[in-house]
Amino acid sequence: MESVTLGVRKGAWTEEEDKLLKKCIEKYGEGKWHQVPLRSGLNRCRKSCRMRWLNYLRPNINRGNFTADEVDLIIRLHKLLGNRWSLIAGRLPGRTSNDVKNYWNTHLQKKLITYPRAQPIPKTQKTIVPKGTEAQPRAHPKSPPRPSPPSNNEILWWDNKTVSPQIDNIGIHWSIDGSIFEEPILGNLQSAGDSFLQQNQSDWSDIFLEDVNLWDLLGDD
């Protein structure tokens, strides 16, 4: 086996080798490629015999130009199967895997197909804080300001207002300088007070006179 392996012929096939391979396939059929070199008398490996038959010697091979339907089918099958040329060629009657691969590399890969590129993952931008500065806390929404308590001046002013209100109903008004100016109602009050004092004075005078007369009488006795 080692001597046979070392003596395997490589390179281009001759016409005589092609005839021997055709006769072997016509007699035994396709398959069992490991027996083809012995049955045909060829000094070739089984892979070389299989590729030579499928790509060049098979009688139903189509050597014409690829049609638009075939090109469209190749593109769709390549999206599904990738570079599995034997499977793609099996869907195209009369086309070999070698012809499909060559047509793809020559016409379609560079002109029609653009492989999608992986989208780069966007990097999260980091905020650079200069040295010596501290991160400021987030600004929270300010609550409405609370009313401040009244000052002492305001309290005194309000006390004065409550203690000495303006009495419009009885005719008393505060003047600009703080003094009170009187209206007729104050005059009436004053006259009433004067009459009251005069009456009291007369009463006390009568009592005094009565006391005097009484002492006089007592003195006379």
From Swiss-Prot:
The keyword Nucleus applies. This is Transcription factor MYB1. It is found in: Nucleus. PANTHER family: TRANSCRIPTION FACTOR MYB8-RELATED-RELATED, TRANSCRIPTION FACTOR MYB90. Keywords: Activator, DNA-binding, Nucleus, Repeat, Transcription, Transcription regulation. The keyword Transcription applies. The gene is MYB1. It comes from the Eukaryota. GO terms for cellular component: nucleus.
